[in-house]
Amino acid sequence: QDEYDAWINDKKEEAFKLAELTEKEWTTAELVERGEGVYATNCVACHQTNGQGIPGIFPALAGSDIVLNDKPKNIEILMEGVQGAAMNSFDYLSEVELAAVITYTRQSWGNAENGDGEIVTPKDIVDYKKPKI
């Protein structure tokens, strides 16, 4: 019973921390800073440091219409992956990590100046995960 109670308490603490992080008012700078690390760990091998990808194999994120202007599709691709392509789902990342890496790509390589520059917040990711009725 003690082990179970400890597990329950850990889960409650995780849920509280997640709620705290998703409700926080994140600045663009905070998301970009965190997103740069997430990108380096999860994205750079395919999309490259400069966001140019590998022509004919992995698409560029720099100048991408989706990254520039289609926030809902941008979230969907990271959450669902792209069927028939090498892009897998990254739904195992936390809401904060997903929001940060998407914001990082939307703010990097000239994308902020050429697109809508809109940030993605952890709350956007939580909203995406809600069941669609």
Q: Residue ranges of each PLM-predicted region?
A:
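Flexible coil segments in periplasmic/lumen-exposed cytochrome c-class electron-transfer proteins
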Residues: Q1-E30, D91, E95-V96, A100-I133
